[in-house]
């Protein structure tokens, strides 16, 4: 038993849990031990860590072990089973050399990272180590800066420890990382106003940071102006639904976006439209003091009706400039989060019409959610939880995206690290990507490859299909097309 071992490369999101390979779990763990915890130890510490085992996953206690050993994306961990549920863990760097822990371990690991010529080659906002945001008035008022969820998740940033913000000239400011328990948002507070003043950043300005040091104290470098441009069409912008935007029923519009589209002086009304064509009319205001545009009276209703919560990342596209401006809500895909603009807001009230409209849409949303649950239950008995029935809407086809039922993904151990392929009735495979589309409920969605898959199977909008889950490897699975399904839901 002492020679049994397995290894795992660490991927984005590894702090939440670690999945034990299926083959190792079936051969060495399942049915052998009644205990629900494992003991982990390493040569770096005399501490023995107790970690909860939930099925094939290491959960409670794993995050503390990972943080204590400064594990990062790209590292490899090797588990050697010593006895029963006791494991010795060896940590390897991306070069597959064992990580040496000591007084200078941070410097040694930093040198190892710098040996990779591609480590800091990219400077655009498409680089996962970068993020762009705008200086919201409330961020100056409350002296804090929020980190986009996508950036935090991709780089394994946690809400504790130290972080240094460095400007282009090398001058640095020290901060303590914090995290909001309610929503998991990571932020820094105290000193943000000083940083902005020293670097000429004003309300409405867009800035871009690049993570240049991960080991020990994190270091973010402010990139030159102009580096914040992302791959989005100039008629688009990405926004973060900050808690204050909902509290004050207001959303600030990026100065750069308004200026590039020649609408930075406009006032009056603005229409927000969702993917289904339903519209909301909001007030468009211009702050003369700073030249910042904002929309108010109806923003909260729009978010409520479209299932947007605090921390959601959304993309708008300006589809009409003449007359009343129209912003269309686009599909919210995680790859665009790296250029998210963390908009926060000032106080303004909601009108009665928006509130009534919100209540009406919430009722419709609840009816649809209940209907969706009925569809899932029809095909998810304990003996066949590998099957799932999905109803296709016009939006799913248009955006080539589809959400998966939460019970289905949880029962089958599907997560963001899972590689998924779609298999049509002709035996052809279609690649798709699993993305987290609802951060609070941990709901996953399939993005890409979906449109071609349904066309190959002759499926049209508003039809339902049954798929079968087939695991190929530990983290690789296939959703196989079984048949079309007629659902009679009353």
Curated annotation (Swiss-Prot):
Pfam families: B3 (PF02362). Residues 3-95, 130-226, 236-333, 387-484 bind DNA. GO terms for cellular component: nucleus. It is found in: Nucleus. Keywords: DNA-binding, Nucleus, Repeat, Transcription, Transcription regulation. PANTHER family: B3 DOMAIN-CONTAINING PROTEIN REM-LIKE 3-RELATED, TF-B3 DOMAIN-CONTAINING PROTEIN. Its main location: nucleus. It comes from Arabidopsis thaliana (Mouse-ear cress). GO terms for molecular function: DNA binding. This is B3 domain-containing protein REM14. Residues 352-364 have a biased composition (Basic and acidic residues). The keyword DNA-binding applies. Residues 343-367 are annotated as: Disordered.
């Amino acid at each position: 038993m002492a020679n049994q071992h397995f290894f795992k490369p660490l991927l984005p999101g590894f702090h939440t849990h670690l999945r034990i390979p299926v083959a190792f779990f079936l051969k060495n763990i399942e049915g052998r031990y009644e205990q629900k915890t494992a003991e982990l130890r390493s040569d770096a510490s005399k501490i023995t860590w107790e970690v909860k085992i939930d099925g094939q996953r290491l959960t409670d206690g794993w995050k503390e072990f990972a943080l204590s050993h400064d594990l990062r994306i790209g590292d490899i961990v090797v588990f050697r089973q010593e006895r029963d549920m006791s494991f010795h863990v060896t940590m390897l760097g991306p070069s597959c050399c064992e990580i040496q822990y000591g007084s200078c371990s941070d410097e040694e690991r930093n040198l190892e990272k710098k040996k990779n010529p591609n480590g800091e080659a990219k400077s655009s906002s498409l680089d996962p180590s970068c993020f762009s945001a705008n200086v919201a008035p409330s961020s100056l008022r409350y002296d804090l800066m929020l980190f986009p969820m996508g950036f935090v998740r991709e780089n394994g940033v946690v809400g504790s420890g130290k972080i240094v913000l460095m400007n282009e000239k090398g001058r640095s400011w020290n901060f303590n990382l914090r995290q909001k328990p309610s929503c998991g948002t990571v932020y820094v507070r105290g000193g943000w106003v000083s940083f902005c003043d020293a670097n000429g950043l004003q309300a409405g300005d867009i800035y871009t940071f690049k993570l240049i040091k991960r080991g020990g104290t994190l270091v973010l470098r402010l990139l030159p102006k102009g580096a914040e441009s992302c791959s989005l069409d100039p008629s688009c912008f990405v926004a973060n639904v900050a808690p204050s935007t909902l509290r004050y029923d207001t959303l600030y519009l990026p100065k750069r976006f308004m200026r590039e589209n020649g609408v930075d002086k406009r006032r009056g009304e603005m229409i927000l439209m969702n993917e289904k064509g339903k519209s909301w009319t909001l007030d468009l205001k211009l702050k003369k003091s700073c030249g910042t545009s904002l929309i108010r009276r109806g923003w909260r209703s729009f978010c409520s009706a479209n299932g947007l919560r605090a921390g959601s990342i959304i993309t708008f596209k300006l589809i009409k400039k003449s007359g009343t401006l129209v912003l269309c809500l686009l599909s919210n895909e995680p790859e665009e989060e790296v250029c998210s603009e963390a908009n926060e807001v000032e106080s303004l009230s909601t009108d009665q019409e928006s509130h009534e409209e919100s209540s009406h849409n919430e009722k419709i949303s609840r009816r649809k959610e209940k209907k969706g649950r009925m569809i899932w239950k029809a095909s998810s008995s304990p003996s066949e939880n590998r099957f799932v029935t999905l109803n296709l809407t016009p939006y799913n086809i248009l955006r080539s995206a589809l959400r998966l039922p939460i019970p289905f993904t949880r029962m089958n151990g599907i997560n963001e690290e899972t590689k998924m392929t779609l298999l049509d009735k002709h035996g052809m495979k279609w690649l798709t990507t699993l993305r987290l589309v609802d951060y609070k409920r941990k709901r996953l969605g399939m993005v890409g490859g979906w449109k071609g898959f349904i066309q190959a199977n002759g499926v049209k909008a508003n039809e339902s299909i049954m798929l079968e889950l087939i695991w190929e490897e530990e983290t690789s699975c296939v959703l196989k097309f079984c048949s079309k399904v007629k659902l009679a839901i009353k």
